[in-house]
Structure formats: C-alpha cells, structure tokens
C-alpha cells in the first residue's frame, strides 16, 4: 500500500504502481468487466496519515477508483494535484453505512453517499466481488 503523487508523469512512480497493482487491464478485459473506473466521488473524510501526506486544500475534494489485477487505485484530486493510493485486494475492506468507506492497511477514506453513490453503485459492487 502506498500513496504516490501522480500530478506529473514519472516513469519510476508508474513502475512502482504497476509492480504493486499489476499492469492496467487491456481493452478486451476492460470491455469484459464493463469498465474499470468509477465516476468521481465526493470525499468526506480521510484518516490522519493520508491527511498528513496530502495537501491541505479547501473546498470539495474528489476521488475516483480504478480496478487493477492485484488491487485498486484511489485517485485523489486536490486542486491541481493528484495522488494515487494503492490498496491490494488482500488489505481492502469496504464499509457501507452513513458514508461509503474504503479501508486498506490501517488507513481509510470516506465518501459522501449523495449523488455519487447512485452513479457508482454498480461499479462498487465489482470491488466487493
């Protein structure tokens, strides 16, 4: 599990993410799965360790999720910066309560369940499978 700054393309960071999560799915796999990415979701809260590593940006923060062969990547958009949080499937826990929460390796991120929940419900069921 790692948190990477992917605002600018960096081949070393890309290699690390691919080694940890597996290479991105090819076109045929993407079609078979019915898509590998969520729509953007509104972030409600982070765990403290993610808050410390990411920027302090006021206003609404968004994230989307990408499926990979060995785990998921949560792309966190904060202003002009983008961070990628990699979570292997064996460390992934998903909770559905007042908020939709993803836990991995002792960290978590909470998403608002308003509009984005309805738009992403089908995709989020793929993660649970």
Feature-to-residue mapping (PLM):
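Phosphoinositide-binding peripheral membrane targeting modules
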Residues: 56-95
């Amino acid at each position: 599990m790692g948190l990477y700054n992917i605002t600018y393309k960096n081949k070393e960071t890309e290699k690390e993410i691919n080694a940890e999560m597996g290479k991105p799915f090819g076109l045929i796999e993407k079609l078979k799965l019915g898509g590998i990415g969520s729509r953007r979701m509104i972030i409600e809260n982070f765990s403290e360790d993610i808050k410390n590593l990411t920027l302090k940006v006021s206003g609404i923060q968004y994230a989307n999720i990408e499926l990979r062969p060995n785990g998921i990547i949560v792309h966190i958009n904060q202003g002009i910066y983008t961070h990628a949080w990699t979570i292997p499937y064996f460390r992934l826990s998903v909770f559905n309560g007042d908020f939709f929460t993803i836990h991995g390796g002792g960290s978590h991120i909470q998403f608002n369940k308003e509009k984005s929940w309805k738009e992403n419900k089908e995709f989020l069921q793929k993660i649970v499978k």
